[in-house]
Amino acid sequence: MISLNLSPSLNPGLLHKTRTCQQPTRLSALLVTNPKPFNHRHPLGLSPIPNLQIRDVSAKPLLSLTNPESSSGFSRKPRSIAAVGSSDSNPDEKSDLGEAEKKEKKAKTLQLGIVFGLWYFQNIVFNIFNKKALNVFPYPWLLASFQLFAGSIWMLVLWSFKLYPCPKISKPFIIALLGPALFHTIGHISACVSFSKVAVSFTHVIKSAEPVFSVIFSSLLGDSYPLAVWLSILPIVMGCSLAAVTEVSFNLGGLSGAMISNVGFVLRNIYSKRSLQSFKEIDGLNLYGCISILSLLYLFPVAIFVEGSHWVPGYHKAIASVGTPSTFYFWVLLSGVFYHLYNQSSYQALDEISPLTFSVGNTMKRVVVIISTVLVFRNPVRPLNALGSAIAIFGTFLYSQATAKKKKIEVGGDKKN
């Protein structure tokens, strides 16, 4: 075995002595170039020979050129081919890169527009046909159960035909999901009860107060919020109060249903963050599908107990009111399918965009839904009622901005730590 120690101050004579002191080796076992005068570009005195390999017949490397930092005490990082190419690139290549970036931005903008467009459209369709069905069949427990049933069937079809990856279901996951599914059930049925009692626009105005409950419950559980978040909920409270006082179709049951729905969905979100931390591999759509199935198991037995005896006579009244059974079936079917679709789109939108963009989009969604339902059902709106609704929705926008800044600060602090 021949051992060589190369450094910038290598003495060729020392190399000769080292070789003569060792056992004789064959000429093919060693390849060394003749020493040359000191060259500033190559301080080892070696010319740069591409792919020069120095090997011994014994299969062990005779000479290994490693990182200079570990052998000679200095660092010399070679310029990569990509770096050389980029420095000498012509303006045409730079313009091509700029065009590619512009096309990518346009594609993302188009994709974002499609996601938001589908989300808004599906939400509008659900709210319109859900209200149409409830106007002739005022039994929200059955209708809410059917909507969960439609979503459950939809997800089972996707999983069965491998149109969407099926999540790995385990006993710990089901146990962790029991709480969020229960609160989701409470939020969904309460909203349906509210829709059956009052105008859709009024329910959505009251549901815009969800951030108020989120801040209160999260604070009780130990979370802290900056002053800007607390100030942002003031216009929400004021706007909802003004809208409730001036609402033409005011009903205490409708108001209570919307408020309970806020509590249910807030507790669902809080409980999900705490109980599902160990199941982050399950994406939002699969999580919502599992919640829908469990919520159906929660809701339908209670629905039979609450209003099951009224379903048959209520059905006959609904058919008599509409005129044809197919029209009534069409309304109910659309309410169920589009209830799932708009929730599916919301989860997909959340995967594609930032939480801030999502919250702003969700705020604007309420505006679009309120205006659409007012136009479709021709609900009378007083000026003060419209003002209160606008103040409440503006408050939700301020809340989304304030919470987004809070999350940015938290993420920045985590990176520094």
Curated annotation (Swiss-Prot):
Q: Which residues form the signal peptide?
A: none
Where located?
A: Plastid, Chloroplast membrane
PANTHER family referenced in this protein's UniProt entry, alphabetically? SOLUTE CARRIER FAMILY 35
Write out the entry's keywords from A to Z: Acetylation, Chloroplast, Membrane, Plastid, Sugar transport, Transit peptide, Transmembrane, Transmembrane helix, Transport
Query: How would you describe this protein's topology in the membrane?
Result: Multi-pass membrane protein
Gene that produces this protein: XPT
- Tell me the ranges covered by the EamA domain, including all copies: 127-243
Q: State the name under which the record lists this protein.
A: Xylulose 5-phosphate/phosphate translocator, chloroplastic
Q: What biological-process GO terms show up in the record?
A: phosphoglycerate transmembrane transport; triose phosphate transmembrane transport
